[in-house]
Amino acid sequence: MSHLDEDRDSPLWRHWLKLLSDGRQLTRFDGRGFGLSERDSPALSFEGLVADLEAVADAAGIARFPILGFCHGGPLAIAYAARHPDRVSALVLCGTYAQGRAVRNPTPQDAAERQLLLNLIELGWGQDSPAYRQVFATRAIPDATAEALASYCAIQRASATPGQAQRLTQLFWHIDVSDLLDKLRCPVLVLHARRDDLVPFSQGQLLAQRIHGARFVPLDSANHDLQADEPAWPVLADAVQTFLGEHGGQPAPRDGRDLAALTPREREVLEHIARGLDNEEIAAALFMSEKTVRNHVSAIFAKLDFTNRGRLIVWARDAGLGRQHRD
């Protein structure tokens, strides 16, 4: 769970934010029911959360970008990347899973423990005393400083109401996106702490095994949320920086042309143009008539001020499009 205002100055996340924003634009958002977003949303579902991610990506106006899926954000990132391969240049999955806890461990004993955790959320999440919330904090960051543990407890309380925290927790426990793993087409980096108590290391292994070509980096840590002062942090930071440097996409050319001027459908057509497809091939790939493709191509030429298809392809590739079939 997150809270954009609280996260900014937290010892839990300062080093993460610096890593991810160094030399690149970082776009974050509080998910439905979290942080600064509307609380107690009546429509809470996995499909709704994926739709929220789609809305944020469209509103940002960025044609192609890498995504970091951390913890519960991982399944959402996987679903988005599987549905929008033309938009995602790379995927970083850290401390996350394909199968929620209730899916991967459907035993009576685990069901009893899950109910106990839900009871703890109901009783202690909103209390002034952090005693109940420390149960979750010490599982997430057992080797963290007292300051980081206190910050974790404070962010928990600020991020969601007890009722919403219960509903979100139950939703995440029952997620299963394992059927989407073989549909991912972008480069994928998987990182996971070996002694993670919240999301077992085996889930990171499963992701790396099931996603074709995934790069797997095991981390020698017990912390679900890696801390800046532990030896595993520079390992993670170096892996992420290297991976994004290779696959994070190029900045849009600074010539006055802007991909944001295109509609989502026009961006899809331009993605296929950048891959070198002709109009007939694009029509087959996108299930539309050649006449419709020609209309989209004409609109793209007009909006981006091109008259030559070859120059358009060069420009689009410089903007990060067309990489899927060329890397």
Residue spans of the language-model regions?
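Conserved HGGG/HGGXW glycine-rich cap/lid loop of the alpha/beta-hydrolase fold
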Residues: 1-38
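Conserved acidic catalytic loop of the alpha/beta-hydrolase fold
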Residues: 47-65
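Flexible "cap/lid" loop of the alpha/beta hydrolase fold
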Residues: 78, 82, 89-123
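Short beta-strand/loop motif that positions the catalytic acidic residue
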Residues: 184, 190-192, 196
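Acidic catalytic loop of the alpha/beta-hydrolase fold
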Residues: 195-199, 225
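Helix-turn-helix DNA-binding segment
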Residues: 252-298, 302-303, 314, 318-327
